[in-house]
Amino acid sequence: MNETPETALRRALAMIEPASVRASARIDGGYVELMGDAKAPNPTMASRAMNNRGVAAIYENIWRPFGVSMMGIGGLPMSAERAKAVADLRLRGPQRVLDVACGPGNFTRFLSEQLTEDGIAVGFDISEAMIARAVRDNRGPRAAYVRGDAAELPYADATFDAVCCYAALYLVPHPLQVVDELIRVLRPGGRIAIMTSCQLGLAPLRTVVGLGSAAVGVRMFPKGQFTEMFAAAGMTDIEQDIRGLAQFVSATKN
């Protein structure tokens, strides 16, 4: 098959379920639009930033590296994060990969480049600004983008071989529901990987950091939040790597 960005987009559309949702979707600006004219919610300072075209333009080279540096000693540069994602997801061959809250596609395109044959990486985000930037900067023959609500993923159970969400769960309104959805659409034997915030330190420090984060709309998750959630879901090979105020957690679905 001669893979192009256009064929990847058509394949991304064909994966959407149920059929009624797929029928109501439209191709708009180089991505699959599932939200119609609905705008992304902007209840906090952080969410407003993620829906801003100016932030989308500088996200990969300025905004995100700055955010990583603010997470403290041990934060990984973008290149190392991408390499870790590939290792944690165990990417190889013609896999289907879902990158939720993909932003401007800075991970989606890289993940897609690790795939072969009819493999595809689907970047999924609710922000029009981020999706538009992803199409502009990070389209590819195995990378396609969808705008929709990650709390209700439009895919059948066990659709994907690997699913991930990097640097976003602390911003979304219903993060645990998003993780439940990621687990649902992952096939048995597939890998899930997330990177998010981690609440560490003595109680007074946790309180100060928590209040400061909440003021701008960023959640701080307890250290055991996702390892315990994955274990409760019957997942295995659970791994956690804590770096400063960030945690990387991955697991295999049984």
How would you label these PLM feature ranges?
Residues N2-M50:
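N-terminal auxiliary segments of SAM/dcSAM-dependent transferases
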Residues G72-G93, F110:
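Conserved alpha-helix/loop element of class I SAM-dependent methyltransferases that forms part
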Residues R96-E152:
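Class I SAM-dependent methyltransferase SAM/SAH-binding core
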Residues A151-A162:
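A short acidic, Gly/Pro-enriched loop at the edge of an enzyme's catalytic core
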Residues A162-H174:
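A short SAM/SAH-binding and catalytic strip from SAM-dependent methyltransferases
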Residues L176-P188:
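A short glycine-rich, Lys/Arg-flanked "PGG" loop and its adjoining helix->strand segment in the class I
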Residues R191-A215:
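Conserved class I S-adenosyl-L-methionine
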Residues V218-A233:
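Short alpha-helix
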